[in-house]
């Protein structure tokens, strides 16, 4: 029964576009909700800078991102552990992923239920996306049904942090 105080430099998450999934078009690059960072100019890109949206509101970047729910690669976590970061192997962090999520697919060895973060399948499935995935498979890129099992290589529909048509963020779960 622990409580966590979340402190953010930005304001409350009362801006309506924060909660609407397509609202990231109105929150990214908006100084009210985004720090509006840019990368350093890169000579390999003709000295262009690329926007690097970071949330400036309660919930941080989880309040302005594209809602994708994709964990890191299992091997990356294991490398962190091998570098001396105890508690950071895939097997160490997986229980926390399970505890955090309320997975609409239900509980299994890679997903949990009852946590504060609602995770659901992407609702929009378009023929052009299916054609893209079929083409990728034809050239040897595997289809992935679940990007959160530790091996993200491939293409497929991702899951999102959304519940009842609204964004789930660090501020609202």
What function would you assign to each model-found segment?
Residues 1-99:
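N-terminal glycine-rich phosphate/pyrophosphate-binding loop and immediately adjacent elements
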Residues 81-173:
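Conserved redox-cofactor binding core of oxidoreductases
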